[in-house]
A protein has these predicted regions:
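RNA pseudouridine synthases
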Residues: 1-308
Length: 308
């Protein structure tokens, strides 16, 4: 089977990471379990030799990923409504509703964004595993924009922009609390929570994570903010603001066990409203915006009505 060759040079902030985790972090459409399988099958090499998934990587190490080129997926295409805001030969931009899982996983084997994409765009076969075309994700209950790649040219171009941190990924969020300054930066490394596998946490040994924010509207005890990702760690915005004692309104995982109020929300107030990147085909910069969905807009109006 033909292979796609990816060479990675380990940067200082990845020092000591397990090889399988490092590869999964660097190759956006590769899960950790699939990375482990590739290592065990000899398709991932560390400094030119075989390695174990648990091997620790060090700055300057060369990691070579020899990934079998994805064949048509066995996933089932499902005719699920999909809000496509842009498409060309290389990429698709979709506006994901809250409640939709991005890719199949235990407990969510169908009804996902991937199943819907395969019905609408059956040519999406890059990526293999259970995530064809997926190069970044949104949590199940986070709504908004994300880009999906349709071929290798699109995947390589978008991944290069992610690594160079040139993409724009901006979110609207309501947090519990106020800010003294109109804007700021949260620079706090993130990793898996030491005792709760469902959560991420700020850890000295974690990966670099940086979130820029700007106050959009003072809502009394709450604040509407724009959060912009410089890095893209799991649950990054939710963990960062919880760490600063400003948890997202309605967040069931990182918010208080007994929130002061919900304002009718059944999920966290977080919406990926702005997405910008250079088109793989031409290099032209494009930017897309998504309005707040009805549940978040209704909650915002309730917050405005009670604000002093």
């Amino acid at each position: 089977m033909p292979e796609d060759v990816i060479e990675l040079v380990v940067e200082p902030d990845a020092k000591g990471l397990r090889l399988d985790r490092y590869v999964a972090d660097q190759v956006a459409d590769l899960s950790r379990s699939y990375a482990r399988q590739l290592i065990e099958d000899g398709h991932i090499r560390l400094n030119g030799g075989d390695a174990r998934p648990s091997a620790s990587v060090q700055p300057g190490d060369l990691v070579t990923v020899l990934r079998p080129i994805a064949q048509p997926t066995d996933l089932v295409a499902q005719d699920i409504p999909l809000n496509v805001v842009y498409e060309d030969a290389d990429v698709v931009v979709v506006d994901k509703p809250a409640g939709m899982v991005v890719h199949p996983a235990p407990g969510h084997l169908d009804g996902t964004l991937v199943n819907a994409l395969l019905a609408r765009f059956p040519d999406i076969t890059v990526g293999g595993d259970l995530r064809p075309g997926i190069v970044h994700r949104l949590d199940r209950d986070t709504s908004g924009l994300l880009v999906v790649t349709r071929n290798d040219r699109g995947r390589h171009a978008i991944q290069a922009q992610q690594l160079a941190r040139t993409m724009t990924k901006a979110y609207l969020a309501v947090v519990d609390g106020r800010f003294k300054e109109p804007e700021g930066l949260i620079d706090a490394p993130l990793g898996r929570h030491p005792t709760d596998r469902l959560r991420q946490a700020v850890l000295a040994s974690g990966r670099e994570a940086r979130t820029h924010y700007t106050v959009v509207e003072d809502l009394g005890d709450y604040t509407l903010i724009e959060a912009r990702l410089e890095t893209g760690r799991t649950h990054q915005i939710r963990v960062h603001f919880s760490h600063k004692s400003r948890p997202l309104l309605g967040d069931p995982l990182y918010g208080p066990r007994k929130p002061r109020a919900t304002f009718g929300l059944t999920r966290q107030f977080l919406h990926a409203y702005r997405l910008g990147f250079a088109l793989p085909s031409t290099g032209a910069w494009v930017e897309f915006r998504s309005p707040l969905p009805p549940d978040l807009q209704a909650a915002l109006e309730k917050l405005r009505a009670r604000a002093p």
